[in-house]
Amino acid sequence: MSKIQDAFAHGKAFIPFITCGDPDLETTAKVVRAAVENGADLIELGIPFSDPTAEGPVIQGANLRALRGGITTDKIFAFVKELRRDVKVPMVFMTYANVVFSYGAEKFISTCRDIGIDGLILPDLPYEEKEEFLPTCRQYGVDLISLIAPTSENRISMIAREAEGFIYIVSSLGVTGTRSEIKTDLASIVNVVRENTKVPCAIGFGISTPEQAKKMADISDGAIVGSAIIELIEKYGTDAPEHVAEYVKSMKDAIRS
């Protein structure tokens, strides 16, 4: 069992997404620790990119603030290495293929292993092109996380059969952001996934309330929340950690209930 799968072994997982360097890395570190102390089972860390095509305005804004603040991939690597001294839950990077290519794919992925990153999510990487990264990820023991959006049963089955770490089920087509209602038939997608793999699956995109998180975790193995956390960070800045702590606790309590 990979370290990522182990995060799902003790019940439903809560997975927060946090953009590195928004508003600064010191605050990011405090937010990560606050999330873990209040029940986060796995942390998704966003490496900012100037053209984040999967993101809505909230996370796009976080990317731009971090980039304006001088964030770089190397600074994030050094930051994670330091964070790993006391943060023991699995951590994955979410970024874009161009970030990995421009750094050098093997150098990027081997550094992930060296600093304690357990997986990599590339939302702009089509399933058909994953072989560009998969052999290197396997060589260095970094899970390449598959995303499944609402699509045909055959395609869901195909992606699920080859998945590793966990499967990120996208709740609805479009970009990230909070939604008042999620209308996709996610239970059917999860059923197809489970017929094809034992790899756990978590649902993300659009989840912001404890009620939504519970509903998604009841269907799947966990809930992923990004924009709602980024909104707290944008609103409270360096005071965000205490607010994120409270929010994560409410979400984790909901999915446990």
Model-found features: residue ranges?
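Alpha/beta catalytic cores of nucleotide-metabolism and tRNA/nucleoside-modifying enzymes
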Residues: I76, N191-V199, S208-S257
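N-terminal amphipathic alpha-helix/helix-capping segment at the start of soluble metabolic enzymes
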Residues: M1-I18, K81-R85, R256
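Active-site beta->alpha loop and helix N-cap motifs at the rims of alpha/beta catalytic domains
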Residues: I47, Q60-L122, I255
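Catalytic cores of alpha/beta
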Residues: L25-A34, T151-R161, I203, I207-A223
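Active-site-adjacent beta->alpha loops and helix N-cap segments on the catalytic face
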Residues: M1-A7, S50-I59, I71-K81, F101-K107, ...
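Glycine-rich phosphate-binding active-site loops on the catalytic face of alpha/beta enzymes
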Residues: D41-D51, I117-I121, P126-E129, S171-G177, ...
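Hydrophobic faces of well-ordered beta-strands that scaffold small-molecule active sites
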Residues: F14-I18, I43-L45, M91-T95, L120-L122, ...
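Glycine-rich beta-to-alpha transition loops that act as phosphate-gripper elements at the mouths
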Residues: T19-D24, M94-S102, P126-Y127, L147-T151, ...
